[in-house]
Structure formats: C-alpha cells, structure tokens
C-alpha cells in the first residue's frame, strides 16, 4: 500500500514526464479535462487540470465536477505513475477504473501509453 505522500510524489513525477514528452504534448494539444484521481484504500484524492494540453500542477483533494475519474488502489496507481506497471494491462484486469467520456478515456490511455513507453 502506498501512502498519500508517495502517491502524490508519483503523480507529480508522472505529470512532469508527460509535459516533457513531445508525443504526449501533441496528443493533448487541444484537450481540456478536469480529472480526479482517487485511491480506494487510503485517504488520497487529487485533482489534475489539463487546459489546452498543458498539465497544471496537481492539487490535493477533489475540485469541481470532473470530466474524468480514475480510481484504484494506492499501490496500483503509484506503480502506474512511476512507470513500473503497464497502465493498459491494469485497466484491462480491472485494477484501475475510469469514468468519463470515451474521448477523455482514450486521450488518457494514449498519454499513459506514451509515458510508459518512454520510460
């Protein structure tokens, strides 16, 4: 089980790698999405705001009504954010759940894949 602090650190690192990745920036260039990241086993929830493809700093807690929600155990989420596990396989196995429009989910999948492959 990852702590809230470990999950926050992993998420910050993930967002930094995403912003530095050219393929991610191209994929997200016109994407606006308010995303909630929620751990199901510890009290850890974060808001990620993407405006015009730019990843804003991660915020503690949940803000406003999200376009996309990502839920999973703290360990599964941290392993994905650190790049230790393939996000697609975790999603297919049901370890991670997403809720939102198909377009937002597909963009998140593309972003996760590009970051994972670039590690």
Briefly describe each language-model feature range.
Residues 1-119:
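Feature captures hydrophobic
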